[in-house]
Amino acid sequence: MCGKLYVVATPIGNLADFSYRAIETLKTVDLIAAEDTRHVKMLLQHYAINNQLISLHQHNEEQAAPGLVEKLKSGMNIALVSDAGTPLLSDPGMPLVKLAKQQGVDVSPIPGACALIAALSVSGLPVTRFTFEGFLPRTSSARKSFFSERKNESATWVFYESSHRILASLEDLLEIMGSDRRIVVARELTKLFETVVNDTLDNVLEQVRNDRNMQKGEFVVMVEGAVIEKNVTEITEEQSRVLQTLLKECSIKTAVAMAVEITGARKKVLYRAALDMKGNN
């Protein structure tokens, strides 16, 4: 009988966020595959979990995945955990999950803490559509290129950043996006010094630059999507009828102003249409 692979979320800071189901799962599996066994061992000891640990990180996961899948197919139950949060989201585990699915192994999520979702939930930015970009490139030139490619993205986009690069990354972001783009910087979520700042890019950068504490910890940065203006050049029949009626009694300026109030059409488009109407009379 084939075993099951459990993808288990762990706390991102506050241990009280560790679910009862996650704890019970880790107590009952045969093996726990962890990103950093030393880090995860401290968490497990807190809950008196003494199951066998095996290291699964970005440098060995391609080689380790086949062996773990064979263990699953032999009947072992295995839990996959990262150092903090939900595995696979900027953390190791994809090769194992992908191969397990390909080999017909049942993969089950044990949901819980996730820095990405926690940050979005308190951001105040639109979250109907969002793009998660993981960690940014390390060099300034690569980051600027990365930002330039996403400058006109209409959805909210999110990235993780470390304490030693947060200031430089925000400076690069300002250079490409401009000062008025709204961003949210969420720092140390669920921890003692949790901070969430929502403001224009220039104001957020100034706050981070002037406060050394704002340069410490783990960061989730969310960037408001670009506002794409529709290139409307024509008016509807109803808007045209209203404008023509007003032009019979009013000047172009007054007629356009009133038509904007009545129809909600753009002033520039109505003004151009009014000039055409007057020119044809």
Residue positions per predicted region:
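Glycine-rich, flexible N-terminal cofactor/catalytic loop recognition
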Residues: 1-58
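A contiguous loop/helix-start segment that scaffolds small-molecule binding in enzyme catalytic cores
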Residues: 2, 156, 163-281
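Loop/turn-to-beta-strand initiation segments
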Residues: 3-5, 75-79, 155-156
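Short active-site oxyanion
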Residues: 26-32, 104-108, 156-157
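General beta-strand structural signal in soluble alpha/beta enzymes
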Residues: 34, 107-112, 159, 185
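Conserved helicase motor
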Residues: 56-62, 136-139
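Ordered, amphipathic secondary-structure segments that act as subunit-interaction surfaces
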Residues: 74-84, 89-92, 161
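Class I SAM-dependent methyltransferase SAM-binding "motif I" and its flanking Rossmann-like core
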Residues: 95-153
